[in-house]
Amino acid sequence: MSSHDQRASGMNFVERHGLWSSDQFKAAESVEQEIQAQKLELVRFSFADQHGVLRGKTVVASEATKLMRSGVAMTSTLLAKDTSHRTVFPVFTPGGGFGMPEMEGASDFLMIADPTTFRILPWAPNTGWLLCDIYFPNGKPVPFATRQLYRNILASLSDRGFDFVAGLEVEFHLFKLENARLAPSDCTWPGEPPEVSFIHQGFQLLTEARSDQIDPFLEPFWRTIVALGLPFRSMEVELGPSQCEFTFRPMSGLQAADAMILFRSAMKQIARRHGLHCTFMCRPGLPNIFSSGWHLHQSLLDLKTKANAFVSDGAGQVLSDLGRFYLAGLLANARAAAAFTTPTLNGYKRYRPYALAPDRVIWGQDNRGVMVRVMGRAGEPTTHLENRVGEPAANPYLYMASQIISGMDGVARPRSGCVGRHALRG
């Protein structure tokens, strides 16, 4: 059936191009019912750009059902932005700077909702939210869409018999917003940074008194995160002034990256509505500040046995052979992967010796001074690797994809002497 015939038959964009699974079609029906049952008025359609920033449009609820299947048009310049939100490719030249006719002339692409991601936003009255994948009008996936790239990596990993399991440990700064800097003279490109003050003085790591001091600030955040259905685990007062940490239970595959995208965006929006400013910038330019990191806890699930593939057989080894080879791959590819684990210049300010942040490519068993911290013992089902290299501003899809590619390269090409069996005894 030609595209013209498909249009004539009344098929929508999703149906014409076979974009949804049966589970997604079922989820779409549930979304429609939920919109009506909850009397939602607005639905936000969002996608994660190259930097892991959510962009999108808000539509009235009565249009959401149709647009889930037909798509929401967006300008392709959104795929050509730097971190200051400037378009940095010549989009009005042949190929649009990408060598692709689809990117010429600031033309449109389409956001297609993933109905399984639907949430009702607790902080925005009568508003739903959908995370989207992005396609060109001809039905082809945007080849550099980071969520799709990560999904492809996960599919390749699945073909090898594994799924990726990740736990999020994310540091951030939460400030009082003293001056949002909205005067006309402040509205430069990029805009002037806000004036802020701290919510705690720092240097009292994990004290209960300091935790209680900031509890009134953190309560609306953790309550909202729980209401969103994210697997929230703990909140902690960190070492630096106005620095905090949230952790999440392990998640598999796409769920972990999607959770980080939603968490980060939610925190910023909730903060602004409460007169606060939340930033995942690694090292804000303020006196006495401490750098924030994003530690990515990771392991592989054996799809046949449903067991943790990093667990040793109990013969005195902390990691299985596969786990050792995966670790060796993380180490061998760490420099290349840094483009995705630490994508900003600011992130490199964190790499200092004796600063609880890695400044060299090394591993250790339960050692917070190394890049990759091996957690667990022989036969321990929760055995995993904690890569401490990342910054909180990293694109989750690219960060996690880089870990899988790096680790599985180590599995495919075992490196003798990189991580020897004798060095990993439990």
Language-model segment annotations:
Residues 2-18, 27-30, 262, 269-270, ...:
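Catalytic-core signal marking the mid-to-C-terminal active-site face
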Residues 2-234, 256-259, 426:
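ATP/Mg2+-dependent ligation/transfer catalytic cores
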Residues 42, 127-131, 167-171, 243-245, ...:
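Broad gene-expression machinery/nucleic-acid interaction feature
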Residues 49-51, 135-141, 210, 250-256, ...:
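A generic structural motif
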Residues 165-173, 190-208, 228-248, 277-297, ...:
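Core alpha/beta catalytic barrel or barrel-like domain that forms the active/cofactor pocket
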Residues 208-212, 234, 251-258, 282-289, ...:
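Alpha-helix capping and helix-loop boundary segments enriched in small/acidic/polar residues
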Residues 249, 253-284:
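Gly/Pro-rich turn-and-neighbor structural signature
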